[in-house]
């Protein structure tokens, strides 16, 4: 009897010692799973963050820093208006806007759908000899020809500028080349602020006026 009682006592003590260890092991396993799950879920957004930081997803180029940060002339403001109206709110494009008005192209540009406009800056127009600029600005037919040469009838992404040739509204073609954030039009005009969205167009601001070949 004493022997039997002793065996029962030993078994009880052993069970009391083993049970907490087993419970602790289970608890540790669950915690490890939770930590693994937490680390997995926390790493998920990293891919989307890097994607949203793609520099080609928005406007690019050295002259973009001169665009107003707020108001209708800002990138957000321009995106709400059709292209001629959007350009009129950008101080760096005032000469272009004046030319568009003289040529009677405001409604044409504002009512067009899914176009690309290569928009010369004020400095680009200033590069033209003064007598030539005055002549062009006072010749509606010539002015219309030049301005419509800056418009392509489809929205172009930066990638499509890498090695492109596109018919313009003027009918003749212009060429584009480059990569990354550096592009040229007709090998003579640099894109200084590109991929600017408006309500109906994508705008690439350029540093030279483009001239039709014919």
Model-derived features: where do they sit?
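Mature, structured domains of secreted/extracytosolic soluble proteins
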Residues: 2-214
């Amino acid at each position: 009897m004493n022997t039997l009682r002793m065996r029962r006592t030993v078994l009880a003590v052993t069970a009391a010692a083993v049970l907490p260890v087993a419970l602790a092991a289970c608890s540790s396993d669950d915690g490890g799973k939770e930590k693994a799950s937490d680390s997995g879920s926390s790493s998920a957004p990293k891919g989307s963050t890097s994607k949203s930081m793609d520099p080609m997803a928005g406007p690019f180029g050295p002259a973009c820093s001169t665009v107003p940060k707020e108001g209708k002339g800002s990138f957000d403001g321009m995106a709400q208006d059709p292209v001629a109206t959007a350009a009129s709110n950008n101080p760096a494009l005032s000469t272009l806007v004046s030319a568009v008005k003289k040529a009677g192209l405001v409604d044409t540009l504002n009512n067009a759908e899914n176009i690309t406009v290569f928009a010369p800056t004020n400095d680009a127009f200033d590069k033209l000899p003064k007598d030539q600029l005055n002549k062009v600005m006072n010749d509606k037919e010539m002015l219309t020809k030049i301005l419509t040469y800056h418009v392509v009838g489809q929205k172009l992404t930066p990638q499509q500028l890498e090695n492109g040739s596109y018919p313009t509204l003027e009918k003749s073609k212009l060429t584009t080349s480059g990569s990354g954030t550096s592009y040229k039009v007709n090998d003579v005009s640099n894109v200084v602020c590109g991929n600017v969205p408006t309500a109906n167009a994508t705008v690439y601001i350029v540093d030279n006026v483009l001239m039709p070949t014919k």
